[in-house]
Amino acid sequence: NQYYSGDKDDLSFPKPQQLLIKTIIKTGVPFVTVVTAGSALDLSLLDIKSNAILQAWYPGARGGKTIAEILFGKVNPSGKLPITIYKSLEGMPEFTDYSMKDRTYRFMENEALYPFGFGLSYGDIDLIEAAVEGEAFFPKDESDKFTIKAKIVNRGTQASDEVVQVYLKVVDDANEIPNPRLVAFKRVHLEASEEKEVDIEVSGKAFTTVNDDGVRGLFGSKAEAHVGFGQPNELTKRLLGKNNIALFF
């Protein structure tokens, strides 16, 4: 941030770093951006001009070696964003507004720059199929459990990890939040050309919502789940070039 300490006033890079970015862009030379930061920054210009962006967070004393191994292809990156990268602060609620409207991937109405759960790798892993083992029904109790079986294949030439994610929304519950929410996930390692079936457990509690009295319960009767490598929205589909598979309860 502009003061190099404390809370940020905005999502911009410090002024000297903004100047560095613009100077590099002017050279016309292809470049990769490594972002070492503990929170979201404005990456809108880099999204257009940088050939790739590696979000390194705060990697520690040996982070430089790990970053170099990723950049030179010795390590295949497979991380997923645990936050949302917004396009800008424009349209965001005021800091003094404590409602959840437009905050986090669960309540956002506008499109993000990079969505929660998104991340690329050097691999090429596809989701072939996904289905609920046994009968798919809306749970009657929080203790009910479902197993989703997902079949994935590595079409690439090197070993790779992928994170299979399950998002869910109760479609006939007025208490439900606007967007599907992450309820389960599993990281999977595949060798080149390997095909693997993954079991992901979803509990009945994932179908619960909280009403206006603050009571959590099973208030709906129909739900839709989405299995894939990211959120079930158009932005993630464009960025990954892959579709999710919908399941119905």
Model-derived segments and spans:
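C-terminal non-catalytic regions of proteins with extracellular/luminal or membrane-system context
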Residues: N1-F249
